[in-house]
Regions:
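Acceptor/aglycone-binding surface of glycosyltransferases and processive sugar-polymer synthases
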Residues: 68-83, 88, 100-179, 183, ...
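Hydrophobic helical membrane-anchoring modules
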Residues: 1-3, 153-156, 178-244
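Short, well-formed alpha-helical segments that are part of the catalytic scaffolds
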Residues: 12-26
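Acidic helix N-cap motif at the loop->helix transition within catalytic regions
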Residues: 14-17, 45-53
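Conserved short acidic donor-positioning loop in nucleotide-sugar-dependent glycosyltransferases
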Residues: 41-42, 68-71, 94
């Protein structure tokens, strides 16, 4: 089968090449063809120049830079999806919190299922949580709260509405554009998949510690946390109305 791996990046110079090499290891047996699409949100740490040097000897890697002043994960993914040549789309965080070695698990199920998601909330899943990092703690609390709320309101058979680690058929989402913040866009995407009767499989994985770079997720001050929480709630209400 053929796979387009989309990597949204922002100041990932410290490890982006290591990540790409790790992804490539999943395809060493040549049974599956692939391309790696890097969509950079105008990094300032040398990520772009590092990628361009690496690309000269790696034809499987494609680089696209968003020079928009407003950095946005969903828009980066939309660009990556539009540039993808293959039917099976995989995207994951570029900071190693989504371990690339799990891509091999996707190979087992992507033919049978329209959507394969790695969940942090299944029995065999392991989540990284550093209690010494306050912003991380806030994000963890938010993630737990919103996933429980979404599970209660929407579909109980989905455990992780804000995962961000997914494989999905390109033709199944050709009529939509991803919108919103990190968790908000993923929530809306999953609601869309359920409403359109796409077959969905969740798999457990072991979340890891972010290596280096700048997070595209929430983070930041308590004010920022409250604002994003509010946006999430609005998004949930909108999806309730759509579901009705």
């Amino acid at each position: 089968m053929n796979y387009s791996i989309i990597l949204p990046t922002l100041n990932e110079n410290g490890h982006i090449i290591q990540l790409i090499k790790s992804i490539k290891k999943n395809f060493h047996n040549k049974k599956n063809n692939y391309e790696i699409i890097v969509v950079d949100d105008n990094s300032t740490d040398g990520t772009i120049s590092t990628l361009k040097k690496f690309k000269k000897k790696n034809k499987k890697v494609k680089i696209f830079v968003r020079n928009n002043k407003k950095r946005n994960l969903a828009e980066s993914l939309n660009l990556g999806i539009s540039k993808a040549e293959y039917e099976n789309l995989i995207w994951l965080d570029a900071d190693f919190q989504h371990p690339p070695e799990y891509i091999k698990e996707i190979f087992k199920y992507s033919k049978e299922y329209d959507v394969v998601i790695f969940s942090r909330f299944l029995k065999k899943s392991i989540r990284y949580f550093d209690k010494n990092i306050k912003t991380k703690e806030a994000n963890e609390d938010q993630s737990i709260f919103f996933n429980k709320l979404c599970k209660f309101i929407f579909y109980k058979d989905i455990t992780d509405y804000t995962s961000g680690y997914i494989c999905i058929k390109k033709n199944k989402i050709k009529n939509i554009k991803l919108k919103g913040y990190y968790g908000e866009y993923f929530l809306s995407l999953l609601i869309y998949c359920k409403k359109n009767n796409l077959s969905i499989l969740e798999l457990p994985f072991k979340e890891k510690l972010r290596k280096t770079g700048s997070s595209k997720t929430i983070g930041g001050s308590k004010v920022r946390y409250v604002v994003v929480c509010f946006n999430y709630i609005i998004s949930i209400i909108k999806n309730i109305l759509i579901k009705i």
